[in-house]
Amino acid sequence: MRLVLLGPPGAGKGTQALRLVQRHGIVQLSTGDMLRAAVAAGTPVGLKAKAVMESGGLVSDEIVIGIIAERLDQPDARKGFILDGFPRTVAQADALDKLLADKGLKLDAVIELKVDQAKLLDRILNRAAEAKAKGEPVRKDDDPEVFKTRLEAYNRDTAVVAPYYSARGQLQQIDGMAPIEKVTQAIDSILETA
């Protein structure tokens, strides 16, 4: 099973990806997590990405595609994967199609979590408050100003990825504002027919 989860920041892509990993034994390939790990490790890619990520901007396609290509070659990705936070641009979607074709693979599903963007800031603030209450660090990208920058970048650059996949007949849409379990059930229904 190979799939892409689309939606703006705070839509629940990471939450649903984790549930899919637990239910289906596939790996979550979150560019955000991979980039944060590279930043924490101080790798050359991480150093390049750090300043861009902290300001809420998008990391270059070259860096992200390189990380994805390397990750797809790892043994645990052979059973299947979920791409969360990638592709973020039509150029990345096209590059992903080419990368998968070169590896003899294709996507089984592209699922967009449709959300009310006016309510996303509340969702992000709740996520930050929950992290604080648990004594966990708050993600830098959960800062309200950084979140607004990320949402603007999504609307400017990434929102066009859904129509890219829709034009190819690959896009399925789900109400991302529904309760978490309902969203999971809707995704499972799509995957049963994929």
From Swiss-Prot:
GO function terms (MF aspect): adenylate kinase activity; ATP binding
Gene Ontology BP terms: AMP salvage
UniProt binding sites for AMP: 31, 36, 57-59, 85-88, 92, 139, 150
Annotated region described as NMP, given as residue ranges: 30-59
GO cellular component terms given for this protein: cytoplasm
Pathway assignment: Purine metabolism; AMP biosynthesis via salvage pathway; AMP from ADP: step 1/1
EC number(s) recorded for this UniProt protein: 2.7.4.3
Pfam families: ADK
Superkingdom of the source species: Bacteria
Residues engaged in binding ATP: 10-15, 127, 178
Family the entry assigns: Belongs to the adenylate kinase family.
Protein name in UniProt: Adenylate kinase
Reaction(s) catalysed by this chain's protein: AMP + ATP = 2 ADP
Record's subunit section: Monomer.
Region: LID, residue numbers: 126-142
Sorted UniProt keywords: ATP-binding, Cytoplasm, Kinase, Nucleotide biosynthesis, Nucleotide-binding, Transferase
Domain notes: Consists of three domains, a large central CORE domain and two small peripheral domains, NMPbind and LID, which undergo movements during catalysis. The LID domain closes over the site of phosphoryl transfer upon ATP binding. Assembling and dissambling the active center during each catalytic cycle provides an effective means to prevent ATP hydrolysis.
Disulfide bonds: none
Function: Catalyzes the reversible transfer of the terminal phosphate group between ATP and AMP. Plays an important role in cellular energy homeostasis and in adenine nucleotide metabolism.
Subcellular location, record wording: Cytoplasm
Signal peptide range: none
